Amino acid sequence: VYKRQIENSTKANSLRMIGAAETELADYKHGVNTPNDIPSMLSIAASYEFLPVLRASVEYHFFDDKSAGMAGGKQEFLTKGTNEYLAGIEWDVTKHLTLSCGGQITDYGLSDNYQSDTSFSCDSYTLGFGAKLNLTERAALNVGYMWTTYDDYTKKSQNYNNTGLSGTNIYSRTNKVFGASINYRF
């Protein structure tokens, strides 16, 4: 496990929550160090070339998040480490054009006590597509698009934000990413 400290370098703290005690903002004050270890990781991968122009690969990653120290002992609230399952395929359509696609499933060991409004995770799946266009013998244009959909995580509370009332938070998000690059080999 690699240990690291994240230090806030806040010039002005203008964040104010109505009715919030000063202690609610203590983690974000200038100079506060937040421990967050990098977990150990196991990775297994295999690839196969079906034809000289058609390749596929599969991977599995395990992150031992439950053993990595986090601020406030947050890792204790995980039920297990993170599992990632990946697969992809690449096809050289011509000597100038390569197409690819792949997917990833991520499964965290989440619990209600792990999730908060300032830091949450959600299980997800990702689909991606890409193309490589060889412009010259040394230069290539790469483009790609990926879409990650996260499972909603519902957290119910009998004392929502210390109001004495019951309430529900639904943690969710979606990522859509486009990328383009020109690669040059020297």
Spans of features found by a protein language model:
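Outer-membrane beta-barrel porins/channels
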Residues: K3-F186
